[in-house]
């Protein structure tokens, strides 16, 4: 039976039926894995935000206006932008998947797993994202699954 409240034991099932902890060694390895994946989530979020800001800053300047005040062309070329957009979308998808897996791991209601995830997210933010100068104000969300 699955726990519906926080508990503090070493026996836990994380994400899959085959990922069960029944000893201190397996439990500590699980906590380390949760910590590492949480920090990796913040690393990917940082890469995604930096990639997005780089791709938006590389946009070509607008074409010069004609004498009538209309700029041309109406539809910009999208050769390199589509590749950058596809990479950005892929990074977002991987980041979202990791975030949802972290959320599901926290829903095991094991106190140690929950703390390992929160500490991993905090450490990852401190290492990878704390010096980004507020560039992520629109995406600064404490929920790792969004």
Swiss-Prot record:
The keyword Transmembrane applies. The keyword Transmembrane applies. Highly expressed in leaves and stems and at lower levels in roots and flowers. InterPro entries: Cop_transporter (IPR007274). It is a multi-pass membrane protein. Keywords: Copper, Copper transport, Ion transport, Membrane, Transmembrane, Transmembrane helix, Transport. Pfam families: Ctr. Induction: No change in expression levels after treatment with high concentrations of copper. GO terms for molecular function: copper ion transmembrane transporter activity. GO terms for cellular component: Golgi apparatus; late endosome; membrane; plant-type vacuole; plasmodesma; plastid. It is found in: Membrane. The chain crosses the membrane at residues 24-44, 101-121. Residues 55-74 are annotated as: Disordered. Involved in the transport of copper. Belongs to the copper transporter (Ctr) (TC 1.A.56) family. SLC31A subfamily. This is Copper transporter 5.
């Amino acid at each position: 039976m699955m726990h519906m409240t926080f508990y503090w034991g070493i026996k836990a099932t994380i994400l899959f039926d085959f990922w069960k902890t029944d000893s201190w060694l397996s439990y500590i390895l699980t906590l380390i894995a949760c910590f590492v994946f949480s920090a990796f989530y913040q690393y990917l979020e940082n890469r995604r935000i930096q990639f997005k800001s780089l791709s938006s800053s590389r946009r070509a300047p607008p074409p010069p206006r004609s004498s009538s005040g209309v700029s041309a062309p109406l539809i910009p070329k999208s050769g390199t932008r589509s590749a950058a957009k596809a990479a950005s979308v892929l990074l977002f998808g991987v980041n979202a998947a990791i975030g949802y897996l972290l959320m599901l791991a926290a829903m095991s209601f094991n106190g140690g797993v929950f703390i390992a995830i929160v500490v991993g997210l905090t450490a990852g933010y401190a290492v990878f994202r704390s010096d980004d100068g507020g560039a992520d104000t629109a995406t600064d969300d404490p929920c790792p699954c969004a």
